[in-house]
């Protein structure tokens, strides 16, 4: 009955046209369905991954978490009811709208709408990105991750770890408190940041080429006010990314090169080097916290903090072996 991955997300917006442009011409997703009040965006072979609808408020609407099959969905529903969680079985009309076979709906302790489903519809039609990109890294890893905020972490984190069985990956305490959780080999599918406010911090979408990130950053630099966090590289999931403000006001992380973790042998631990190896100047932090983050990054650089790149077949070429001194020092190299 374990959750497998983040399968889809729903988003509320006051301006659907802005989301259509942002999702396609900036993020590179494919617009597959649009009406007066809703639109759907595709990232891969799934018929839809991001569902946006018009609303008086901006923000997330729902998070769709995937299970393997009908038996897993029924087992989870029974487990939730036994744990005192009020659930509703999704109607046939809702399942059709979400493009899935079946789903259940419930809320976490701070009011986030969660949908758990199985049997997402797929298509054999080639993915046609809204701008020229290599594609998104999805598959068994899911569509990316969501980082939520909470007024009191102790009010919500146990729900995800003890009832929904999210597994802790790691956590950091400076320059802000953040806790990361995995379902599969993606370093985290969910995280929480302690902000004193319930809501969302960001969603992350991962592309298959570093150049896709750099070219999106060039687009963002033409409107500097949309950049919430500058280009940089995370210490824990090792993603190279930047963050932009979506039309719904929350941040979207656009990244490349996330690490794959060995879930069977993983030990949760504190990350003492801060959230980033370099870059990622966070405009959303208070001035004192922003300066603290910069000081931490300088310390990481001085201590030789670094990590290997995470590549996959088709997006790299191995450089010719022309550095004997590099090979000779391989055992002593610090790679994170």
Language-model regions, residue ranges each:
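Conserved active-site tyrosine of GNAT-family acetyltransferases
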Residues: 19-24, 80, 111, 156, ...
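A compositional/structural signature marking long, glycine- and acidic/polar-rich segments
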Residues: 172-238
């Amino acid at each position: 009955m374990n959750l497998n991955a983040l399968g889809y997300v729903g988003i509320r917006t006051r301006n659907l046209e802005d989301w259509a442009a942002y999702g396609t011409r900036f993020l590179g997703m494919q617009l597959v369905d649009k009406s007066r009040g809703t639109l759907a965006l595709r990232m891969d072979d799934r018929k839809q991954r991001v569902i946006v609808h018009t609303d008086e408020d901006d923000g997330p609407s729902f998070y769709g978490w995937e299970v393997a099959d009908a038996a897993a969905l029924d087992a989870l529903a029974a487990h939730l009811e036994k744990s005192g969680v009020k659930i509703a079985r999704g109607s046939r009309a809702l399942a059709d709208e979400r493009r899935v076979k079946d789903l259940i709906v419930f809320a976490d302790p701070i009011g986030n709408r969660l949908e758990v489903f199985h049997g997402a519809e797929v298509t054999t039609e080639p993915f046609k990105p809204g701008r020229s990109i290599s594609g998104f890294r999805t598959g068994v890893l899911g569509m990316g991750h969501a980082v939520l905020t909470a007024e009191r972490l102790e009010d919500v984190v146990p729900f995800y770890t003890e009832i929904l069985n999210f597994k802790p990956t790691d956590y950091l305490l400076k320059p802000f408190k953040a806790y990361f959780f995995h379902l599969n080999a993606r370093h985290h599918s969910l995280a929480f940041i302690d902000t004193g406010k319930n809501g969302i911090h960001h969603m992350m979408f991962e592309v298959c080429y570093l150049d896709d990130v750099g070219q999106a950053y060039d687009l963002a630099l033409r409107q500097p006010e949309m950049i919430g966090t500058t280009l940089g590289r995370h210490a824990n999931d090792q993603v190279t990314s930047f963050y932009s403000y979506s039309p719904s006001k929350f941040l979207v992380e656009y990244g490349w090169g996330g690490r794959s973790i060995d879930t069977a042998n993983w030990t949760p631990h504190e990350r003492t080097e801060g959230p980033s190896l370099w870059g990622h100047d966070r405009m959303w932090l208070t001035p004192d916290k922003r300066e603290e983050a910069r000081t931490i990054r300088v310390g990481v650089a001085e201590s030789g903090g670094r990590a290997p790149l995470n590549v996959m077949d088709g997006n790299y070429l191995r450089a010719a072996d022309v550095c004997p001194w590099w090979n000779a020092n391989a055992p002593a190299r610090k790679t994170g």
